[in-house]
């Protein structure tokens, strides 16, 4: 592409099959690169470039590597070269190494990410994030789930809180063997520790429990000469969380989804927040 005011822009796209899928349930491992390069901007005298790249590769049947690197030479690239004005845009890059063993009900991952702010407000970055999840007694009536995460949060603005958040959650569920209604109970205990850079450490502990009743109805109807099976399941649920004081805990990656609850599953989940910096309090 030739711009009379800027110069010649070289563009290229590359896509390669790195490795065939290791199983029918997985996808092929693909390397993808898109780039634009202006050797020397006639106005600024500087090189201007854009690079989008990604690699999704199954190292083994259980181990997967995902890499994304997206970056531009400077914040004015889109306005000057692409002739566009993106709103609230940031370019995200990350590296994720994940392990999943369905037979043992175990999964783990490690992640690091970077964000180049273009026209948005800088957000917290996960400099390093590790997590592990395990289901015990998965073949029993009362499976137990254990989730552990540790995340180091950083921010470009020095006045923003930063530090390491470590969380652990253990939960148990039980579905009683009744055909009607279907009764499911659950209980969980959560602990979170914050090691903050310029503030005292904070530890939060909370426990909760819930019960739900489902009333499944099955019936058959005739639609234009074809029989259709229908299933309607009214549900009634109650969730309780103990009251905890958490106003002093910084918000790294958590939002209140109260006004955005649009599904029945969200409404009955008993969880008001995304992320781990806030837990639902009693009567939230």
Q: Model regions: which residues?
A:
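Outer-membrane beta-barrel proteins and related beta-barrel translocases across Gram-negative bacteria
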Residues: 1-284
């Amino acid at each position: 592409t030739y711009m009379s005011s800027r110069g010649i822009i070289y563009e290229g796209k590359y896509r390669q099959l790195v490795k065939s899928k290791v199983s029918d349930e997985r996808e092929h491992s693909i390397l993808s690169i898109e780039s634009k390069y202006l050797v020397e901007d006639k106005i600024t005298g500087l090189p201007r470039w854009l690079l989008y790249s990604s690699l999704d590769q199954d190292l083994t049947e259980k181990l997967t590597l995902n890499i994304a690197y997206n970056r531009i030479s400077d914040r004015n690239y889109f306005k000057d070269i692409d002739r566009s004005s993106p709103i609230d845009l940031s370019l995200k890059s990350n590296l994720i190494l994940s392990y999943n063993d369905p037979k043992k009900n175990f999964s783990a991952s490690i992640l690091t990410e970077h964000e180049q702010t273009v026209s948005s407000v800088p957000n917290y970055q996960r400099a390093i994030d590790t997590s592990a999840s395990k289901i015990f007694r998965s073949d029993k009536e009362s499976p137990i789930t254990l989730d552990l995460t540790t995340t180091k949060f950083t921010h470009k603005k020095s006045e923003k809180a930063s530090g390491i958040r470590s969380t652990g959650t253990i939960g148990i569920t039980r579905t009683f063997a009744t055909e009607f209604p279907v009764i499911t109970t659950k209980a969980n205990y959560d602990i979170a520790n914050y090691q903050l850079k310029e503030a005292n450490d904070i530890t939060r502990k909370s426990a909760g429990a819930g019960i739900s009743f489902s009333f499944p109805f099955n019936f058959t109807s005739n639609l234009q000469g074809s029989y259709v099976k229908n299933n309607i399941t009214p549900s009634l649920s109650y969730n309780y969380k103990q009251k905890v004081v958490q106003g002093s805990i910084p918000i790294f990656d958590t939002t209140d989804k109260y006004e955005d609850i649009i599904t029945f599953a969200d409404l009955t989940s008993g969880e008001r927040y995304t992320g781990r910096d806030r837990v639902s309090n009693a009567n939230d």
